[in-house]
UniProtKB/Swiss-Prot annotation:
Species of origin: Salmonella typhimurium (strain LT2 / SGSC1412 / ATCC 700720)
Up-regulation conditions: Up-regulated following infection of host macrophages.
Zinc keyword on record: no
Record function comment: Is critically involved in promoting the replication of S.typhimurium cells inside host macrophages, suggesting a role in the establishment of bacterial colonization within macrophages. May be involved in the biosynthesis and modification of the peptidoglycan layer of the cell wall.
Protein name: Virulence protein STM3117
VOC domain mapped to chain residues: 23-143
UniProt cross-references to PANTHER family, sorted A to Z: GLYOXALASE DOMAIN-CONTAINING PROTEIN 5, GLYOXALASE FAMILY PROTEIN
Amino acid sequence: MLFFNVASLKYKHHESIQMIIDRIDHLVLTVSDISTTIRFYEEVLGFSAVTFKQNRKALIFGAQKINLHQQEMEFEPKASRPTPGSADLCFITSTPINDVVSEILQAGISIVEGPVERTGATGEIMSIYIRDPDGNLIEISQYV
């Protein structure tokens, strides 16, 4: 379902926009099993699970948060097509990437690709790719 006709939009030059977006506050992952997702992110990546209003679950790390929605029980409003396994996320680590590789392999997780050089938001990164229990692509990167 389209909410607007892209061809009919009249974009203004970005310099005319008064609003300033500073950062992403949180994102939402729709998952097939919240408990399995929490266990993976806690045990493999060291995130912490928290419960907030209405018994909602989230993962926190640093100053970031990922809200978790159970598939077919999403909170409103929600994405147009909430689908487990459709995310591609990049997490930055200060741990040397070779140490990350060792920890990931010791946890019994397969590395999809890497270490490989990529370009992050602020410079060059060295990355490895794994998948979470829903098949989301997880990139773990260190700035070089």
